[in-house]
Regions:
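Macrodomain-like recognition of ADP-ribose-binding/processing modules
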Residues: 1-171
Length: 171
């Protein structure tokens, strides 16, 4: 059985036990995904700000927030928010995850794609780091390659079950 899979969709609706929230270490939310995580888990946002202010969230130091139904792994990918993901930070975080995921009782994990090979200079290097580390995890691992809002996946299902929706019903 292949433990690593790739899919399109909304990571917040993943069946995995642990969801990865890529963060910067300075307490700034600079991605739509992080904003969605922190809106869904406001107590996590408060702790995130505190940890960043106290310099407790650093490259290679992971923080698992335990939600009611999911665990959220706050995963540093850059030190300062206005930077692109930094290979050394991503590698340090993956190394720590590989060393500790069993001790943290992570049984399955979902990652967003936080690298874009052609978008910035280090994209290909970050993609290689991700692929190398993801392939050694011995738990089910899902990488969400493209964000598709959950509503976009439900509409075809509803259409199949009850027929075509009007424009008003789709909203």
């Amino acid at each position: 059985m292949d433990l690593l899979s790739y899919q399109k969709g909304d990571i917040l609706f993943s069946n995995c036990q642990t969801l990865v929230n890529p963060v910067s270490c300075d307490g700034t939310i600079d991605s739509y995904l992080s904003k969605r995580f922190f809106m869904r888990y406001p107590a996590m946002y408060t702790k995130y700000l505190q940890f960043c202010k106290e310099k407790q969230l650093t490259p290679g130091k992971l923080w698992v927030y335990q939600g009611k139904t999911k665990n959220i792994l706050n995963f540093p990918i850059k030190e300062i928010s206005n930077l692109v993901p930094q290979p050394k930070v991503v590698k340090a975080s993956f190394m720590r995850l590989a060393e500790t995921y069993q001790d943290r009782n992570i049984s399955s994990i979902a990652f967003p794609r936080f690298f874009e090979p052609n978008l910035f200079n280090d994209g290909a290097e970050i993609q290689k780091i991700c692929n190398d580390f993801l392939s050694i995890l011995s738990i089910p691992t899902v990488v969400y390659t493209d964000y598709i809002p959950h509503s976009k996946t439900l509409i075809p299902l509803i259409t199949k079950l009850v027929g075509v929706l009007s424009e008003e019903e789709k909203k």
